[in-house]
Amino acid sequence: MSGLYRILVQLEQSPYVKTVPLNMRRDFFFLVVTWMPKTVKMNGSSFVPSLQLLLMLVGFSLPPVAETYGFNKCTQYEFDIHHVLCIRKKITNLTEAISDIPRYTTHLNLTHNEIQVLPPWSFTNLSALVDLRLEWNSIWKIDEGAFRGLENLTLLNLVENKIQSVNNSFEGLSSLKTLLLSHNQITHIHKDAFTPLIKLKYLSLSRNNISDFSGILEAVQHLPCLERLDLTNNSIMYLDHSPRSLVSLTHLSFEGNKLRELNFSALSLPNLTNLSASRNGNKVIQNVYLKTLPQLKSLNLSGTVIKLENLSAKHLQNLRAMDLSNWELRHGHLDMKTVCHLLGNLPKLETLVFQKNVTNAEGIKQLAKCTRLLFLDLGQNSDLIYLNDSEFNALPSLQKLNLNKCQLSFINNRTWSSLQNLTSLDLSHNKFKSFPDFAFSPLKHLEFLSLSRNPITELNNLAFSGLFALKELNLAACWIVTIDRYSFTQFPNLEVLDLGDNNIRTLNHGTFRPLKKLQSLILSHNCLKILEPNSFSGLTNLRSLDLMYNSLSYFHEHLFSGLEKLLILKLGFNKITYETTRTLQYPPFIKLKSLKQLNLEGQRHGIQVVPSNFFQGLGSLQELLLGKNPSVFLDHHQFDPLINLTKLDISGTKDGDRSLYLNASLFQNLKRLKILRLENNNLESLVPDMFSSLQSLQVFSLRFNNLKVINQSHLKNLKSLMFFDVYGNKLQCTCDNLWFKNWSMNTEEVHIPFLRSYPCQQPGSQSLLIDFDDAMCNFDLGKVYFLCSFSMVLSTMVFSWFSTKMIASLWYGLYICRAWYLTKWHKTEKKFLYDAFVSFSATDEAWVYKELVPALEQGSQTTFKLCLHQRDFEPGIDIFENIQNAINTSRKTLCVVSNHYLHSEWCRLEVQLASMKMFYEHKDVIILIFLEEIPNYKLSSYHRLRKLINKQTFITWPDSVHQQPLFWARIRNALGKETVEKENTHLIVVE
C-alpha cells in the first residue's frame, strides 16, 4: 500500500490530475484522473488507460478517512481540531481506541489510561502526528515498528510507565527531537535503540534503574544532534573510561545518583555548558577531572560531598554559575578559605548559589571579599539572624540577592550601603516584624523587593524611603491588618503590588493615591468587608485588580472611580448577593469603560438574583465568569450591555436539585460571543431559540447536565459553531433525539466530544445513542394517530352521553326504591310537617327570603309552613337524606326555576326526587315557579323538568308590581286549603 501512496503523491503534483479536494472531514476521499486525448509521458512511461483505471480503483480502495466528529474514547481540543485528547478513558486496546481519529491530527494525548502494549503499526494512520503523549499508562512492552509511519513526530512522551528495557522500538521516528522515558523501570538499553533518531535533541532517562553509564554512552554516541541528556535519579556510580565523544551535547545531569567520581578524562564533551552532579550520596567524591569540558559555564554540586581542593580552577575558566549549596549538613559547612581560593580563581563567575552554608554575617563578609558576583543566593541559612554591619560592601556589582528562608529579624541601611547596583532583593520567609527608618535607602536602583511571609503587622513608610526605582513589591502572606494613604508614599514608580493573603479588613479613601504608575494590585485572600468610596482613586494606570477570596458584599457608588484603564477585575469568592432584579441606583461597574475580563465566580451564597442593570457600562467586556455560584437567577436582559462579550462561563451553579435559571431572551444581544459554557448546572431542558442570536458562537459546552433531548431549535442559527459538548447528560434514545443523532453523525463543521460513547439513558438499556434504530421514527403514523384520536373522541362522546343517561336512570331507580319505602312509612306512621318544600338555587336565595317566605308564611291571609334548606335541614345528617326527608314530610314541592337553577346538580336531584313522589302518589305535588323566561332548548338536559312543563301548570313571576297579588293568590290556591295539622306545627330551625 505504501507504493500506491507514493504513486498518488506523484500524481497530485501532475497538472493532468484533478483532485477532488481531500476534505479530511469526509468519510471517503478519491482521485479522478482526467483522460487526455493524447498519450502523456510521465517519467518516461506512457500514461495508459489501464493505469488510469488502476489509480481510480486505488483511490476508492484506500482506507476511508475516519469520521471526524464521533469518537468513542477521544475528543478534539475545542480551539484546535488538530489536537485530540483521550485522557482518563480507561483505554486498554490502543488500536481500537484511536481507530476513528482523523488523519490530520497533529497532537495526540493518551495520558492516564491502562495501555500495556504498543503493537506494530499502532499509529500508521496518523502520519501527521508531531506530538504523542503516552505518560501515566502501564506500558511494559513496545513492539518493533510500533511507531512506524510517524515520520513527522517531534515529541514522544512515555513518562510514568513500566518499561524495563529499550530495544529497537523507535524505527521510523526520523524527525523526533524530544524523547521522554523518565519514571519507568529501565535497566537496559540496546546499543542501537536510538539509532533511527537522527534529529533527537533532548533525551530524558531520569528516575529509572540505570546503573551502567557505559551502556548509555554506547546507545547515544551516534546521535549527531543530541544536546540534552537527563540521567537524574538513577543508580550510576562510575563514569565510562573508554574513549568516547559527544560533540553536540550541551547539558548533562547526574543529579540524584550515587557517583563516586567526576572523572571525564576519557569522555570528550567539547560543547558541554551545563553539568549537574547534585545530591550524589554521602561519600566524598575525590576523583575529579573536568579538563575535557572546556566550555563549561554552569556547575551544580549542591548536596554533593566533594573536596574543593580537587577542583582545578584552571579547567573552569569559562564558568559563570556555580551551586555549592550544602543540603547534607552532616559533613559540616564548607571551609570558607577553601571556597574563597576556588572562587577567587574563577574570573568569569557571576552567579553563586550558597544555600545552607553560611554560619553568620562574618561568613558573608569573607565570601564577598573573594569574588565579584552579579547574583548571590544565600537562602535557607538558618544561622543568619541579623545583618547590620556592611556585610556586602565588597560586592558593589551585585545585582540580585536572595536571602529567603533564613532567620533574619533585623537589618539596617548599613547592610547594603555599597549595593548601589542591586535590582532584586528577596527577604521572604524570614522573621521581620518591622523595619527601621531608611532601612532600604541605599538601594537607589532596586526594582524588585519581596518581603512575603514575614510577621509584619504594619508598614512604616519611612523604612522604604529612597526606593524610587522600585517596580514590584511583594508583601503577600504577612500579618498586615491595616494600610492607609501614607503606607505607599515612597513608591512613585511602583507597577506591581502584592498584598494578598493578609488580614486587611478595610480600605480607606485614597489609600493608593501615590501609586500613579501602578498596573497590578493584588488584594486576594484578605478579610476585606468594607471598601470606602474612592478607595482606588489615583490608580489611573491600573490594569489588573484582584479582590478574590474576601468578604465583600456590596459596592459604594464611587468605588471604582478613576480606573479608566482597568482591564482585569477579579471579584470571585466573596459574598456578593442580590435578592431582586430591581434596577440599581448606582451600577457598580458603570465607570469601567475599558474592562475586558470580570470574574464573579464562587460567591459564598451565590449571586442569586442578578439586578437588571448590574453590568451597565461594560461595553468593552470580553470575558465574564459567573460559574461556581450556588445560585444564579438571570430572568431579565442583564447581558444586553455586553455587546463585545466573547467568552461567558456560567458553570457549576447547581445547588442540590435546583438548576440554573436563564431567561429565554437573555443572550439575544451577545452577537460576538464565541465561547459559552453552561456545564454542571442541573439543566433538564432548553428553551427553543434561546441561543439563536449567537451567530458568532464557536464553542458551546453543556456537559454534565440532565438534558434528555437536543433538537434543532436549540442550535438554530449557530452558523459559526465548531465544538458542541453534551457529554455527561441523560440523552434518551427516542424519536425526540432523532435529529440530534443524525446531525451529530453527519455534520462536517461541528465536533461533538465522545459522541460514540453516549449511552441510552433508559432503564436496563446497554445500547448507544449512535446505534439507536430510527426506523420506527420514519414510519408515517399520521393516519394511525388520526384514526385513533377520532375513535377515542367519538367513544368519549358516546360514552359521556350514555353514562349521563344511565347515571340519571340509576339515581332515579335508586331513589324510587328509597322514596317508595320512605313515603310509605311516612304515610302510615307520620303526618306532613310542611305544606311545601322549596327547591331553589343559592343565587335565588335572596328572592326566596325576601318575597316568597313573607308572602306565604306571614300576613293576615292563610299562611303555610315552608321547608327551606338552610333553616330546616337537620345538621349532621347526609344531605341526600335531608332532601329526601324534606320532600317526604312536605305535601308539595315548590321549584323556583331560573337559569342558575338549571345549572345546579342539587336542584336537579331535588326535581328527580319530587318527580318520584308524584309518580308514586299519583298526586299533583310539584309547583313550578319561573323567575324568568327560559327557552325550551335550555331545558333539554332537564328532561324531567321539561316533561313537567308539558304536563303541569306553571306560574311565572310577573315583572309588574300590580300583578304580584294575583301571582301569590295562584300560589296559595295551588298549595290548597289544607294546612299542616296543629300537632305537627313544630319546626326544625337550623342556625
Swiss-Prot record:
Family the UniProt entry places it in: Belongs to the Toll-like receptor family.
Organism name: Mus musculus
Organism taxonomic ancestry: Eukaryota, Metazoa, Chordata, Craniata, Vertebrata
Name of the protein: Toll-like receptor 13
Sites where a glycan is attached: 93, 109, 125, 152, 167, 209, 233, 263, 271, 274, 300, 310, 357, 388, 413, 421, 644, 663, 711, 742
Listed PROSITE patterns: LRR, TIR
GO molecular function: identical protein binding; NAD+ nucleosidase activity, cyclic ADP-ribose generating; rRNA binding
Cytoplasmic domain ranges by topology: 805-991
Membrane topology (Extracellular): 69-783
GO terms for cellular component: cytoplasm; endosome; endosome membrane
Stretches forming LRR repeats: 104-125, 128-149, 152-174, 175-196, 199-220, 225-246, 248-268, 271-292, 295-315, 318-338, 348-368, 372-394, 397-418, 421-442, 445-466, 469-490, 493-514, 517-538, 541-562, 565-585, 594-617, 620-641, 644-665, 672-693, 696-716
Cell compartments where the protein resides: Endosome membrane
Protein task: Component of innate and adaptive immunity that recognizes and binds 23S rRNA from bacteria. TLRs (Toll-like receptors) control host immune response against pathogens through recognition of molecular patterns specific to microorganisms. Acts via MYD88 and TRAF6, leading to NF-kappa-B activation, cytokine secretion and the inflammatory response. Specifically binds the 5'-CGGAAAGACC-3' sequence on bacterial 23S rRNA, a sequence also bound by MLS group antibiotics (including erythromycin). May also recognize vesicular stomatitis virus; however, these data require additional evidences.
Domain TIR, residue spans: 832-975
